[in-house]
């Protein structure tokens, strides 16, 4: 792992899997030592080799078209939770599982849907324990829908269309919050997901 020396003082804002999308004022992290990258590390091996930052030092995370490339997404989210301050915000942008964008890229290893993000919270593990020890509460999922295909439809009609037709959602954005201390894995602690639909 390679860590830059000019990270400033915490709390940090961490741009995870930044690639060439360098964000000014953020700590930019990627698996490749590209210009502007502050921390180089392998996002697939975070259970064995954690990110070289102290616990509870990051209050904002950005993962823009990253998580769909990661085989061990639970390991990634667990490591980010370690770094998160209580109440830290993570914004995850991904292709919707019902779009060609989710499947055409051979480097994508899994598809995501609005309810997928609940599996990064503890209450979703009331039935089974996979060793995941983190708790991210999905606050809102925004579906950016094809403006032409959804013209004249109300939000419920659009949402129904996203459930049964392909390529309606161009992009999905999930906003999650780090819950610390971690909640118990109890079904009754699950909360309803707020879904926002916006034209793209």
Explain the meaning of each model-derived region.
Residues 1-12:
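Conserved alpha-helix/loop element of class I SAM-dependent methyltransferases that forms part
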Residues 9-10, 34, 180, 198:
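Intrinsic-disorder/low-complexity coil detector
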């Amino acid at each position: 792992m390679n860590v830059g020396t000019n990270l400033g003082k915490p709390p940090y804002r961490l741009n995870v899997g930044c690639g060439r999308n360098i964000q000014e004022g953020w700590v930019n992290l990627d698996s490749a030592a590209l210009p502007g990258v502050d921390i180089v590390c392998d996002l697939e091996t975070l259970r064995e080799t954690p990110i070289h930052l102290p616990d509870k030092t990051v209050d904002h995370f950005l993962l823009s078209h990253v998580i769909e490339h990661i085989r061990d997404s639970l390991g990634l989210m667990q490591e980010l939770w370690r770094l998160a301050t209580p109440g830290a915000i993570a914004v995850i942008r991904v292709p919707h599982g019902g779009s060609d964008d989710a499947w055409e890229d051979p480097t994508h290893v899994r598809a995501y849907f609005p309810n997928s993000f609940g599996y990064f919270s503890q209450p979703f593990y009331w039935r089974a324990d996979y060793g995941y020890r983190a708790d991210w509460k999905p606050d809102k999922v925004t579906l950016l829908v094809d403006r032409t295909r959804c013209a004249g439809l109300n939000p419920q009609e659009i949402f129904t269309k996203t459930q049964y037709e392909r390529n309606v959602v161009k992009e999905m954005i999930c906003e999650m919050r780090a819950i610390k201390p971690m909640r118990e894995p109890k079904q009754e602690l699950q909360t309803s997901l707020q879904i926002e639909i916006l034209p793209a």
